Amino acid sequence: MADRFTKMHGLGNDFVVIDARVAPVEMTPARAHAIADRRHGIGCDQLILLEPSTSADVKMRIFNADGGEVEACGNATRCVATLIGKPAVIETLAGMLRVTPADGGAEVTLGEPVFDWDHIPLAMPMDTRDMPVAWDELEHGAAVNVGNPHIVFFVPEADAVALDQLGPRIETDPLFPERVNVNVASLDGENQLQLRVWERGVGLTQACGTGACATAVAAIRAGLVRSPVTVALPGGDLVIRWAPGEPIVMSGAATRVFDGETDWAQFG
C-alpha cells in the first residue's frame, strides 16, 4: 500500500505533510532530510508529521530540511489548521497552539513571547531588547523566543542586506547554543514591516511565520509600530497582533498544492 502525503505552503514556505495518526510513520533526521531534498526527494522547507495526541486534537512534529526536529513553525501550523478544517488545539514541542481556519488560511494563537536571555537561549547574560552585538552592518539585535529562538535586526532597507552570507554566520555563532533564526526588517509604512528571514536549518525562505511574530513583537517592544502589524515577506503578508502580557496571534494564508503517494522506505 502506498504511503500518502500532502504538499502545502504558507506564503511560499513549503511543507510535506504526513498524516500518521492512523498508520504510524517512523521518522528519523536522515529520512526527513532525504524527503526534503529538492533534487532527489519530494522537496520542502520542512517536513510535518501529524501524530495522535493525548492532550490535544493532534500532535505536530516539525523537521527542518537539514533533518533536525524543531519546536515551532507558524506557517506549517496554519497549513495543518486548514487540513483539520475546524477550531482545534495542536500539540507541539513549543506547547499547545490554538488554531481557527479562515477563508484561504488560518489564525494561530501562540504563547507569550519570552525575552529572558537564558530562555532564548543565549550563551551569556545580555539585554535582549538591545544586544551589543555586530556582524558587519547588522548591529544591536533584539532577541525573542516565540517557541523557537530569533534575533531581529532593524535596518533602513531589508533587501539591501546580504542575508545569504550573514545568515549562516549568525545562525551558528557560539552566542546561540541552539542556533538561531535571523530576521532583517525595515519599516514599510505605518504599522507595516518588510521582513527577510534566514531560517535555522533551512536557509533563506519565502516566509517564516514565527519570524514574523518575533519581528512584530520586537518592533512593538521598541516603539516602532503598534498592533496589529502587517509583515510583508517575499511570499506575501502576515498580520500579527500582540500586547505585553498577552499571547501572539498570527493570521495569514495557507495553500494545499497537491496530494501524493510514495514509499517512505526508499528514503532510508
UniProtKB/Swiss-Prot annotation:
Please name the InterPro entries in this protein's record.
DAP_epimerase_AS (IPR018510), DAP_epimerase_DapF (IPR001653)
GO molecular-function terms, A-Z:
diaminopimelate epimerase activity
Looking at the UniProt record for this protein, which Gene Ontology cellular component terms does it annotate, in alphabetical order? cytosol
Q: Per its UniProt record, what Gene3D superfamilies does this chain match?
A: Diaminopimelate Epimerase, Chain A, domain 1 (3.10.310.10)
Subcellular location as annotated: Cytoplasm
Catalytic activity annotation: (2S,6S)-2,6-diaminopimelate = meso-2,6-diaminopimelate
Question: Main subcellular localization, coarse class?
Answer: cytoplasm
Pathway participation: Amino-acid biosynthesis; L-lysine biosynthesis via DAP pathway; DL-2,6-diaminopimelate from LL-2,6-diaminopimelate: step 1/1
Q: Where is the site labelled Could be important to modulate the pK values of the two catalytic cysteine residues?
A: 150, 199
Q: Where is the active site?
A: 73 (proton donor), 208 (proton acceptor)
EC class of this enzyme? Answer: isomerase
| Pfam families named in the record | DAP_epimerase
- Tell me its family: Belongs to the diaminopimelate epimerase family.
Subunit structure, interactors included: Homodimer.
What this protein is called in its record is Diaminopimelate epimerase
Q: Which organism is it from?
A: Sphingopyxis alaskensis (strain DSM 13593 / LMG 18877 / RB2256) (Sphingomonas alaskensis)
